[in-house]
Curated annotation (Swiss-Prot):
InterPro entries documented for this protein: aa-tRNA-synth_I_CS, aa-tRNA-synth_Ia, Anticodon_Ile_ABEc, Ile-tRNA-ligase, Ile-tRNA-ligase_type2, M/V/L/I-tRNA-synth_anticd-bd, Rossmann-like_a/b/a_fold, tRNAsynth_Ia_anticodon-bd
Name used for this protein in its record: Isoleucine--tRNA ligase
Quaternary context: Monomer.
Reactions this protein catalyses: tRNA(Ile) + L-isoleucine + ATP = L-isoleucyl-tRNA(Ile) + AMP + diphosphate
Motif extent ('HIGH' region): 42-52
Length: 1024
């Protein structure tokens, strides 16, 4: 049966599917050492975007690489299914808004809609992953909404509760009034924005002192109605000052930063003198007994503000702790909806966070506003809905993460981070400021918090499993009960302390606890798969966006540290953001979003993958555009494909079967290409093993272009020659080795084209092969160094041709090469044939003396010699101008510039020296050598140049007519004058470049094609 060749991405995907290549790639490594990979779960109720591409590319690259390196790498997909984003999507779909509407709609109905919503785009995610070439098991994923998963999460929470680590507390927490739920510290860290808010310096009148005021600066005027105290620092100095007819008290060091008018200092004293002084609040609230006086607060500083802080315990953690310590009254004037309640009748019903202007107007009306101004600061916003958060005192459920702070930090220090600065930077800094994890959410669609509280004695119980729930339930519970609201809400347990009824708390848990539990819950641990869990914990590698230092990276680390004493991952790669071409964040509203599926359809997945990997390190933010993908396709993917097509084109003619074991060739180019290949393997392996995929990709890119531009170009004649000579066999064997090895080397990066090349050449899937290891015996560093020099000389010469406007098709009679004194070019004659072919040069002269070909221009560097010579500078320049050519050369070559002046010691740096070619030569030079090309064109050279250019044009016609290169043809040319002579003189050159029966000159009247050459028309027909 004839082997079917793979050509398109769809054909390759179909081949992988029908031949189960993904499964085979894993099964082939069974019994080998495992490399454990965790796939961070996306949510399937939104479409994949450009940021998802980078994450999936890196994960796939690592998994494929480690598999080819011999590891057993299982790849289990996951779905993150709970949380507020799902609720908001459902609200929008069914036309409701807010918690009250949800309650009216019915929690059960709402939960059912959420379950449907989470897999709205599962097909798009599957197609996207398949099209990208992302190999992951999506047929048996872990799903956070499934009972087995939730049961494992419950088991973790139950363990924490039994150890006293899960507790109910009253704390000031970040709170979203739009979503009406608290946020954890790591969620808050994801949503900071730079904003300008109104700040105010407020006057607090001292009791029994009509004209004396404390001045307090606040950036949250909307919290003033909740004021219960003023805080000072007893160790700071404060002053009483007079401004016109009023007296103000504030920190001495801050007077000049606050007071703009003329003032007089009346008295200066310690802050301790102010403690217990009473004041009249700007918005007094009835019913408070222990409030409205000055207290000491260690957190008060003289770095900004007035040194006096207004205390609102409902809206600040420091404020709340101070109130607890001093037994002050607590005042809350804001509802959970974020509006003022009737404790603040002036603005009852107004959105508090939006009321700064109204508050300032009220202060002004009461003559209690000293001044107001805009204040720019970093303010937390909800990472889900974008609304500004408030700090709000409320009851909540917390995990005592601070008890494990040192262990968590130590475990983080043992993680290998990419980039390394994340460890002590973004991640380390966040861990240093860790607070207890606020885990409860007053929402609906999530893992229910598994805590039941006795209605009679307040005893708490946290069941660890469904069986535990059944054993303690008052009513019978079905085996298949769904562990979601409202079903678990209806379960009552029997209190083990007093036999009373226990009811579940209303909260669901933070979705980050869901995803952070995946190392355990994906295996239904500890109920099942304990051995499998032990084999898959911890992960060797994870990768997600940099934001996940406050999300998944954090939750994984914290949960596993508390539960198992160690991190759940050994290595973490933190991915940068994908930005638009102007460095702006992509968003639908800006219209700058790139659709990855469209890019894949247009340019292929490999182009997109390679563009993301080779552009810059994956942890860098990337400016990205369609143009970058298009250029990548052109510069790398197409180049690699064209090398394969070149090999395939000639091999279809010769039907040569290359040796499986490559041996040393007799050809210098072959040995150089194979040496470079093995050096590439050696160096790129070092990079990929250190997760530096970008550096590896750049090396591969450079090598591929070198093979295309040099090896293919210089070996074309070897493949073209008739028959199968030993030299031709060497060329085939070498290029076959390059293609099959290179395809294995790039397979983790670009899985489609690597499969096409390797399978079509060998009949075997590249993804079932081992990753290449270098062969020391093939590395010849001296040969590589010599060819590197040859390439530099050729490139320098090409630049000279370009500067002289001499096309490469035009042969030149001679080039002269002069190395500098440090460069040894004694080896160069061995490469003359290569240089001649590359540059279309007849003769090469290697010399240490080019005096016959150049002149020197010598001028003073006036900025250097001016200070040395003063008014004698002009005399020295006159002397230089009078020197003969011979004297100039002698002076420069001897470096004896001191002889020019007895007044100052002159050196080479005091002169501007230019090397100029004589009229008939073109010069090009670098630090290593000087190149001179003879521009004189004899009639014979001109005719040969015309013939070569005409051959190029005929080759284009042949390709246009889709004539195979081995198709025997008759060439009919209608031409006169000098061009006719060019063809006649160089007829053999045509026979060397085409398989022709004959060349016929001016023998027919009508021709198929007309081409223009040197402003003349040439008629051509190709017949076969």
């Amino acid at each position: 049966m004839t082997k079917k060749y793979l050509n398109t991405q769809n054909e390759i995907s179909a081949f992988w599917n029908t031949q189960k290549i993904f499964k085979k790639s894993i099964d082939n490594r069974k019994g080998q050492e495992s490399f454990v990979f965790y796939d961070g779960p996306p949510t399937a109720n939104g479409l994949p975007h450009a940021g998802h591409v980078l994450g999936r590319v890196i994960k796939d690259l690592v998994a494929r690489l480690k598999t080819m390196q011999g590891f057993y790498v299982e790849r289990k997909a996951g779905w993150d299914t709970h949380g507020l984003p799902v609720e908001l999507e459902v609200e929008k779909k069914i036309g409701i808004k807010g918690k009250q509407d949800i309650e009216k709609y019915g929690i059960e109905n709402f939960i059912n809609e959420c379950k449907k919503s989470v897999f709205n785009y599962e097909k798009e995610w599957r197609d996207f992953s398949k099209d990208l070439g992302y190999w992951v098991d999506m047929d048996s994923p872990y799903i956070t909404l499934e009972n087995n998963y939730i049961e494992s999460v419950w088991n973790i929470l139950s363990t924490f509760h039994k150890k006293g680590l899960l507790y109910k507390g009253h704390k000031v927490t970040p709170y979203c009034t739009h979503d009406q739920t608290a946020l954890s510290s790591h969620e808050v860290a994801q949503g900071y924005k730079n904003v300008k808010d109104l700040s105010a310096v407020v006057k607090f009148q001292l009791t029994n002192s009509k004209d004396t005021y404390f001045l307090s600066w606040t950036t949250t005027p909307w919290t003033l109605p909740a004021n219960v105290a003023l805080a000072i620092n007893k160790d700071l100095n404060y002053s009483k000052i007079r401004v016109e007819n009023e007296y103000y008290i504030l920190a001495t060091d801050l007077i000049n930063s606050i007071i703009t008018e003329k003032y007089e200092i009346i008295d200066t004293f310690s802050g301790s003198n102010l403690i217990n002084l009473k004041y009249i609040p700007p918005f007094e609230s009835d019913g408070l007994v222990n409030a409205y006086y000055v207290v000491d607060g260690e957190f008060v500083t003289n770095s900004e503000g007035t040194g006096i802080v207004h205390i609102a315990p409902a809206h600040g953690e420091d404020d709340y702790q101070l109130v607890l310590e001093r037994d002050l009254d607590f005042l809350n004037v804001i509802t959970r909806e974020g509006v003022y309640n009737d404790r603040f009748p002036e603005l009852v019903g107004n959105k508090a966070k939006n009321s700064d202007i109204e508050i300032i107007k009220l202060l002004s009306k009461k003559q209690l506003l000293y001044k107001k101004q805009k204040y720019e600061h970093n303010y937390p916003h909800c990472w889900r809905c974008g609304n500004p958060l408030i700090y709000y005192a409320m009851e909540g459920w917390f995990i005592k993460t601070t008890n494990f702070k040192n262990e968590i930090i130590n475990n983080n220090n043992n993680i290998e981070w990419f980039p390394s600065h994340i460890k002590e930077g973004r991640m380390g800094n966040f861990l240093e400021n860790m607070v207890d994890w606020n885990i409860g959410r007053n929402r609906y669609w999530g893992t229910p918090l598994n805590v039941w509280i006795c209605n009679d004695c307040n005893h708490e119980y946290a069941p660890s499993s469904i069986k535990d729930l059944q054993n303690n339930s008052i009513n019978k519970i079905d085996e298949d009960i769904e562990l979601h609201r409202p079903y678990v809400d209806n379960i009552t347990l029997s209190c083990p302390k007093c036999n009373g009824k226990m009811s579940r708390v209303e909260e669901v848990i933070d979705v980050w606890f869901d995803s952070g539990s995946m190392p355990f819950a994906q295996h239904h641990y500890p109920f099942d798969n304990q051995k499998i869990f032990n084999q898959h914990f911890p992960a060797d590698f994870i990768a997600e966006g940099v934001d996940q230092t406050r999300g998944w990276f954090y939750s994984l680390l914290v949960i596993s540290t508390i539960l198992k004493g160690k991190s759940s991952y050994k290595r973490a790669l933190s991915l940068g953001h994908i930005l638009d071409s102007n460095g702006k964040k992509m968003s639908k509203s800006k219209g700058n979003v790139i659709n990855p599926t469209e890019l894949i359809n247009k340019y292929g997945a490999d182009s997109l993958r390679w563009a993301l990997i080779s552009d810059s390190a994956p942890w860098n933010n990337k400016r990205f555009s369609e143009n970058i993908v298009a250029q990548t396709k052109s510069k790398f993917i197409d180049t690699l494909d064209n090398i394969y097509k070149f090999y395939n084109m000639y091999n279809k003619i010769d039907h040569y079967n290359p040796n499986n074991e490559i041996t040393k060739s007799r050809n210098t180019l072959d040995n150089w290409a194979l040496s470079r290949l093995n050096t590439l393997i050696k160096e790129s392996n070092i990079y990929v093993n250190n997760y530096d995929f970008t550096s590896a990709a750049r090396l591969i890119n450079e090598y591929t272009n070198t093979i295309s531009n040099w090896y293919i170009g210089d070996s074309r004649g070897r493949f073209w020659e008739q028959g199968i000579s030993n030299d031709k066999k060497d060329a085939y064997n070498t290029l076959y080795e390059i293609l099959t090895t290179l395809s294995r080397l790039v397979a983790p990066f670009v899985p489609f084209i690597s499969e096409k090349i390797h399978y079509n050449l060998t009949g075997k899937s590249v993804h079932l092969q081992d990753y290449p290891q270098y062969k020391e015996s093939f590395i010849n560093q001296a040969l590589e160094d010599e060819m590197h020099t040859v390439i530099k000389i050729v490139e320098l010469s090409r630049q000279a041709r370009k500067n002289a406007d001499l096309k490469i098709k035009q042969p030149l009679s001679k080039m002269v090469i002069k190395p500098n004194s440090q460069l040894n070019l004694s080896f160069l004659p061995n490469y003359y044939s290569i240089i001649k072919d590359e540059l279309n040069i007849k003769n090469i002269e290697l010399t240490d003396n080019i005096n016959d070909y150049i002149t020197y221009e010598l001028k003073l560097n006036f900025s250097s010699v001016g200070p040395k010579l003063g008014n004698k500078t002009k005399n020295i320049q006159t002397l230089i101008d009078s020197l003969s050519e011979y004297d100039k050369k002698s002076l420069i070559e001897s470096n004896n510039f001191k002889s020019l002046s007895s007044d100052a010691e002159l050196t080479k740096d005091d002169f501007i020296i230019k090397t100029l070619p004589k009229d008939s030569y073109q010069l090009s030079e670098d630090n290593d050598c000087v190149i001179l090309l003879d521009k004189n064109l004899s009639p014979e050279l001109i005719r040969e140049g015309h013939a070569r250019e005409l051959i190029r044009l005929i080759q284009q016609l042949r390709k246009k007519k889709n004539l195979p290169i081995n198709q025997r043809i008759d060439i009919y040319i209608g031409v006169t004058g000098e061009l006719l002579e060019s063809i006649k003189t160089n007829k053999n050159m045509f026979k060397e470049n085409f398989v022709i029966k004959n060349i016929h000159l001016n023998v027919i009247d009508e021709y198929e094609n007309t081409i223009h050459f040197n402003n003349k028309e040439i008629k051509i027909s190709l017949l076969y």
